[in-house]
Amino acid sequence: MKTYAGIPEENATLENSKVMLVTVPYDGTSTWGKGADKGPELFLDASENMELYDIETSTEPYLEGVYLGGEISEKSSPEAMTEAVYQKTKELLTNEGKLFTLFGGEH
């Protein structure tokens, strides 16, 4: 199981996480400099090299948990991608008390 920042799996389940992260590797309307769709995967790969201890707060924030809620892979049109994001957001927002965030390619 791939986890955010390589955190332990017990801190990466939906039940045990306070943060839900969904990636949207979309690059459908860029006209120059294609590659924004690679951003989310590269971000997750780079997160594995991140220090998990926060020296400024003397805490380990990852213990609050980060759930990877999947990838929105719809690429047929901006409208279809937006609808897929909307549906996934509706699904995950039923989890009260959790922070939902998207990380995309093209913004």
Predicted regions: what is each one?
Residues 1-107:
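Metal-dependent C-N hydrolase catalytic cores
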